[in-house]
Design a protein with these regions (language model features):
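Short secondary-structure boundary micro-motifs
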Residues: 71-73, 80, 91-93, 207-208, ...
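Generic domain-boundary/flexible-linker signal
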Residues: 98-99, 149, 180, 234, ...
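Catalytic core of tubulin tyrosine ligase-like
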Residues: 219-224, 232-236, 241-401
Length: 402
């Protein structure tokens, strides 16, 4: 049975009743390209949250990093100079919570001058490439919502001085969105309501965009993936890359020491013997407060969404089905009469994969400690915690002129 023949799919059927035959022919063609099996995850949404046995994972802490600085840095710079390292910037979001109706990376974080979030990230990268004397290919993941604006922004600002040949854009894959009964919403009478497939879909989206050929042509062996909102992070950090290579691990994760046992941050640990991330709400009180003999928290390091993955391993797991997280969200759509609805409360489900599940598909992962005040300044709000205000103060503390 075709999806539009299913009497349950009232939104699709209502739109088809209003459409012309030509519009319906085009709509049917699009409907046949959509993966409808994703709806089955509504029934299984609780099972994805069933977890195994957690155990602590020892981090490479700052004192050890300082003691082995020359060793780690040499290994990392060698990899960069040999053209083995690429970077992926996850930048599919809009700056809605920051009062922007445009890509989040276009936010001006300056005070007395213009300094854009994208610009600061590229400055961080160029600190490394200037030292290495070699460029790192940067792949920027956008979304259907912000792709054109993002590309235009980079062109207008001449890629902030980075060579254009080393910057490539790709669009994150989209999946359908539905109500709580699994009835697929329509964005308009001719378009299904779709949403990005979560930050775990970045490598699959690169493959779909045909970028695997580019990765192979460049000879990349390591991919550093990171999120747009942390303006302080070091990208393609030679020390981090070197520590991961020297450890023999196939992945690494930058982590910060937790500020408090109950801090709302995912913790890098092991789950059934493999690296994993335990979300703060999955940790028991006993886990959250357990301490080592020296008084440090046993589960004491939180991830900051800056990972290094073996490219070879990424290809090996590319065809594996990642867990689908069914997330309640507010989904704009047209109702059965064709009127636009912008809900104020969650009215259905979106389906997402998460990069933290990618970590669990690795055989090993090295938790690499960075100093919070030097490398973690996320901008999620205009004011308050993790805001533009707090990020500006941290940037100033690191010597950035605003």
């Amino acid at each position: 049975m075709k999806i539009w023949e299913d009497e349950k799919q009232v939104y699709i059927r209502a739109s088809m009743e209003r459409n012309t035959p030509e519009q319906n022919a085009a709509l049917k063609e699009r409907l046949e390209q959509i993966d409808w099996s994703i709806l089955e995850h509504i029934q299984r949404k609780e099972t994805v949250n069933e977890r195994g046995v957690f155990a602590p994972l020892e981090a490479v802490e700052v004192p050890e990093i300082e003691a082995r600085r020359d060793e780690f840095k040499a290994a990392g710079l060698d990899a960069i100079r040999a053209g083995k390292v690429g970077a992926v910037l996850l930048a599919g979001g809009q700056g809605t919570r920051l009062g922007l109706d445009r890509p989040k990376g276009t936010l001006n974080i300056g005070v007395n001058r213009e300094l854009y979030l994208f610009e600061q990230l590229f400055r961080n990268l160029m600190d490394v490439t200037d030292e290495a004397g070699a460029y790192v290919p940067m792949y920027i993941m956008t979304s259907n919502i912000n792709h054109k604006d993002t590309v235009t922004f980079f062109e207008e600002h001449h890629y902030f001085g980075y060579p254009k040949d080393y910057v490539k854009f790709f669009i994150q894959e989209m999946v359908l969105a539905c109500d709580h009964e699994g009835r697929v919403y329509m964005e308009s009478d001719t378009e299904v309501a779709m949403s990005p497939n979560g930050n775990g879909g970045w490598f699959g989206s690169m493959v779909s965009a045909g970028l695997l050929d580019d990765i192979h042509a460049r000879g990349l062996e390591w991919i550093n993936v990171f999120a747009v909102d942390n303006c302080l992070q070091r990208i393609a950090d030679p020390l981090f890359i070197g520590a991961t290579i020297v450890s023999g691990c196939e992945s690494g994760a930058k982590v910060v020491r937790k500020a408090a046992p109950d801090e709302k941050v995912g913790v890098l640990c092991t789950e059934d013997g493999k690296p994993s991330i335990a979300e703060y709400y999955e940790m028991t009180q006993e886990m959250a407060t357990a301490r080592k003999e020296n008084g440090d928290l046993l589960y004491g390091f939180g991830v900051i969404l800056n990972y290094l993955f073996s490219e070879k391993k990424l290809e090996q797991i590319a065809d594996a089905r990642m867990p689908i997280h069914v997330v309640e969200k507010k989904i704009p759509h047209i109702d059965l009469e064709g009127n636009m609805v912008k809900p104020e409360q969650p009215n259905g489900y979106k389906f997402e994969t998460l990069v933290l599940d990618m970590v669990h598909m690795m055989d090993d992962c090295i938790p690499y400690e960075v100093v919070r005040e030097r490398e973690f300044a996320p901008i999620k709000n205009l004011h308050g915690v993790d805001s533009l205000d707090t990020a500006r103060e941290l940037l100033k503390g690191c010597g950035v002129t605003l």
